[in-house]
């Protein structure tokens, strides 16, 4: 193993490691903080919020199925960036890769700010920057160490959730709160709620970016995605039902941490501090895995000369793309020190959905050319693609405009660089 742009990543991870990485990415700050904003978007309707959760899960399942199928066919680092290049062409691949890098880098900043707010609410950027610096060092140390740390964080979060849900439900749930005010939701509100809850599921893409680092990827990635997604869906459904059953829709919509408030309203309010701790730990766990995924995508793009070549260097000691991880860490630190949570989320939302849209389009195109395809492959990819586009349209216009502007800047930059390169290669020049 050498530190060169042609180096290969090590296949160190098994099924359990891949599942843990996916859970670490999905059981992040969203499980504690996404329910409130989603409830506010949906309106005073518990059935509407449950419908939004179901819609988010449907889109996530279609996306996960498409990405898992492609990851087995193309066991490379980079996720939909690699799939887009192979199945649709270089421009599609670049669009997916750039969308992932931009969206998930902004997500890293948002996640770090959530953790920072739990530690130092008045100045969240300071502890957020410290956490990013520490986790940058961990990602440079190698994916096995990253998976071990993530496993510890996942166990802690699951224990906190189990205790918190039991404590919140200990005083009983109001069944009428889960069935009343069905007419309070609007279609747009449900779609916006689904868009917010979707990002809580979105970490399964992290498993796909491990295509070059898992053993037997064609079998392992699909199983890992399925296990992680089902686990997270059960957890989110439990959180939504308990929170609505204790607080009702109005209080849930106004809460920054609904599960914490539900515990505080139960028979053991002293356990509410566990939710605050759990939110910080969950944010740190997802931060670690998402940062690693961004670095792997940057590595893949640098190998293909879509990003600067030094980003493809692999450390001979750890087997990690250390340069890419250092650059990602530096950008995220700058982000947490210069922007707020709302700005970070606005920059990430559109990018993530564009990434998954390309993945579904690639899966749809692949299935159309493959005589051995299963009958469900194209319909699943079509539903996933349509779901991504609908959720983008349902997002607040300002968020869509900001995300598309950054994506357009990247595409324009690529076009300019390609034009300059073509001119240099033209006869009579140089």
Predicted regions: what is each one?
Residues 116, 124-173, 184-185, 225-229, ...:
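Membrane-interface loop-to-helix entry segments
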Residues 1-36, 40-47, 60-61, 65, ...:
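Membrane-interface "cap" regions at the ends of multi-pass membrane proteins
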Residues 118, 136-140, 162-165, 240-242, ...:
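Alpha-helical transmembrane segments of multipass membrane proteins
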Residues 82-84, 89, 121, 226-291, ...:
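TM-loop-TM module centered on a large, flexible mid-protein loop between adjacent transmembrane helices
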Residues 9, 42-50, 64-94, 251-263, ...:
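Flexible loop linkers connecting adjacent transmembrane helices
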Residues 4-9, 50, 151-277:
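Helix-loop-helix junctions that connect adjacent transmembrane segments
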Residues 149, 311-322, 356-400, 416, ...:
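C-terminal membrane-solvent junction of multi-pass transporters and transport-like membrane proteins
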Residues 60-132, 136-140, 280-300, 325, ...:
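Hydrophobic transmembrane alpha-helices that form the core helical bundles
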């Amino acid at each position: 193993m050498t530190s060169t742009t042609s180096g290969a990543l090590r296949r160190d991870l098994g099924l359990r490691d891949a599942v843990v990485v996916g859970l670490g990415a999905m059981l992040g700050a969203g499980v504690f903080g996404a329910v409130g904003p989603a409830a506010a978007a949906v309106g005073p309707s518990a059935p509407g919020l449950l419908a939004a959760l179901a819609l988010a899960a449907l889109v996530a399942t279609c996306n996960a199925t498409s990405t898992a199928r492609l990851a087995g066919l193309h066991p490379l680092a980079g996720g939909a960036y690699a799939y887009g290049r192979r199945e649709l062409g270089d421009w599609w691949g670049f669009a997916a890769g750039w969308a992932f890098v931009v969206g998930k880098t902004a997500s890293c900043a948002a996640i770090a700010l959530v953790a920072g707010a739990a530690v130092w609410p008045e100045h969240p950027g300071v502890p957020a920057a410290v956490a990013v610096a520490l986790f940058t060092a961990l990602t440079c140390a190698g994916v096995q160490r990253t998976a071990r740390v993530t496993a510890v964080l996942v166990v802690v979060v699951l224990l906190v959730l189990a205790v918190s849900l039991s404590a919140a439900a200990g005083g009983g749930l109001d069944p009428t709160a889960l069935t009343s005010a069905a007419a309070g939701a609007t279609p747009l509100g449900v779609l916006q709620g689904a868009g917010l809850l979707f990002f809580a599921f979105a970490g399964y893409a992290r498993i796909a970016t491990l295509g070059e680092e898992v053993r037997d990827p064609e079998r392992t990635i699909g199983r890992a995605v399925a296990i992680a997604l089902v686990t997270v869906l059960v957890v989110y459904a439990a959180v939504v039902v308990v929170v609505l059953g204790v607080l009702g829709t109005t209080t849930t919509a106004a809460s920054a941490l609904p599960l914490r408030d539900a515990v505080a309203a139960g028979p053991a309010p002293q356990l509410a501090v566990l939710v605050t701790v759990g939110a910080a730990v969950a944010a740190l766990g997802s931060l670690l895995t998402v940062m690693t995924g961004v670095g792997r995508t940057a590595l893949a793009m640098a190998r293909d000369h879509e990003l600067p070549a030094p980003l493809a260097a692999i450390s001979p000691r750890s087997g990690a793309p250390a340069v890419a991880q250092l650059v990602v860490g530096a950008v995220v630190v700058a982000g947490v020190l210069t922007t707020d949570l709302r700005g970070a989320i606005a920059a990430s939302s559109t990018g993530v959905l564009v990434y998954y849209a390309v993945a579904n389009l690639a899966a749809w195109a692949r299935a159309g050319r493959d005589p051995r395809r299963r009958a469900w492959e194209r319909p699943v990819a079509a539903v996933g693609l349509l779901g991504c586009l609908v959720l983008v349209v349902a997002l607040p216009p300002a968020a869509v405009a900001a995300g598309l502007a950054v994506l357009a800047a990247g595409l324009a930059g690529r076009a300019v660089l390609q034009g300059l390169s073509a001119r240099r290669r033209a006869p009579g020049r140089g």
